[in-house]
Amino acid sequence: MSPNSSEKQSSADVPVAASPQPGPVSQWLNQQGFDHDALEPDHLGVEQIGVEALFLQVITAALKSNGFDYLQCQGGYDEGPGERLVCFYHFVAMAELIDGKRDNLREVRLKVFLSREGEPSLPSIYGLFRGADWQERETFDMFGIHFEGHPHPKRLLMPEDWTGWPLRKDYVQPDFYEMQDAY
């Protein structure tokens, strides 16, 4: 049976993935003129925003001035072999909740998508949030993401002479590593 023109589906009938609706923080950033990408909220409904590494410090400072005064978590993950590395920052407006100005917690997660080629890097936010110190060091140690301007840019968990980044999906574990005994 040959298809006739009435049976063919037009390209207008094919569903197109809609862009996520910008959340309140994304809308505020738009009003302030900050370039970013609204991402889908996570499974708990937390707003997620994609930013370029170049704008990370400026957008982080803007969020801090807008009440996001606590860096709850910073970390990284690998999207898979040959894919991007992701560095994320989870901010919370803690003072508003403690002061009783709000009944619900405002939170937002920034994500910076990086190429795994070469030495992926982005600016440190240690100057804005001191709590980023060990979190950025752990992300460097496990994924090899360099944080420019970090005051203590060295490994946190692995020995200083360790080769590679253990939480990357393409990491190959060495057959043997001899550690010096402290005793």
From Swiss-Prot:
Catalysed conversion reaction: a plastoquinone + NADH + (n+1) H(+)(in) = a plastoquinol + NAD(+) + n H(+)(out); a plastoquinone + NADPH + (n+1) H(+)(in) = a plastoquinol + NADP(+) + n H(+)(out)
Gene Ontology annotations for the cellular component aspect, listed alphabetically:
plasma membrane-derived thylakoid membrane
Top enzyme class, one word, equals translocase
Q: Which PROSITE patterns match?
A: COMPLEX1_30K
| Disulphide bond pairs | none
Identify the keywords attached in UniProt to this record, alphabetized.
Membrane, NAD, NADP, Plastoquinone, Quinone, Thylakoid, Translocase, Transport
Coiled coil residues, start to end: none
Q: Where in the cell is it found?
A: Cellular thylakoid membrane
Q: How does it sit in the membrane?
A: Peripheral membrane protein
Transmembrane annotation, as ranges: none
- Compositionally biased residues, Polar residues: 1-12
List the GO biological process terms: photosynthesis, light reaction
The terms under GO molecular function for this entry are: NADH dehydrogenase (ubiquinone) activity; quinone binding
Q: According to the UniProt entry, what is the EC number of this protein?
A: 7.1.1.-
* Statement: the UniProt record of this protein carries the keyword Membrane: yes
Q: Which InterPro entries match?
A: NADH_DH_suC, NADH_quin_OxRdtase_su_C/D-like, NADH_UbQ_OxRdtase_30kDa_su, NADH_UbQ_OxRdtase_CS
Q: Its function?
A: NDH-1 shuttles electrons from an unknown electron donor, via FMN and iron-sulfur (Fe-S) centers, to quinones in the respiratory and/or the photosynthetic chain. The immediate electron acceptor for the enzyme in this species is believed to be plastoquinone. Couples the redox reaction to proton translocation, and thus conserves the redox energy in a proton gradient. Cyanobacterial NDH-1 also plays a role in inorganic carbon-concentration.
Assembly information from the UniProt record:
NDH-1 can be composed of about 15 different subunits; different subcomplexes with different compositions have been identified which probably have different functions.
Q: Which HAMAP family match?
A: NDH1_NuoC
The family note in this entry says: Belongs to the complex I 30 kDa subunit family.
What is the protein name for this chain?
NAD(P)H-quinone oxidoreductase subunit J
- Gene it is expressed from: ndhJ
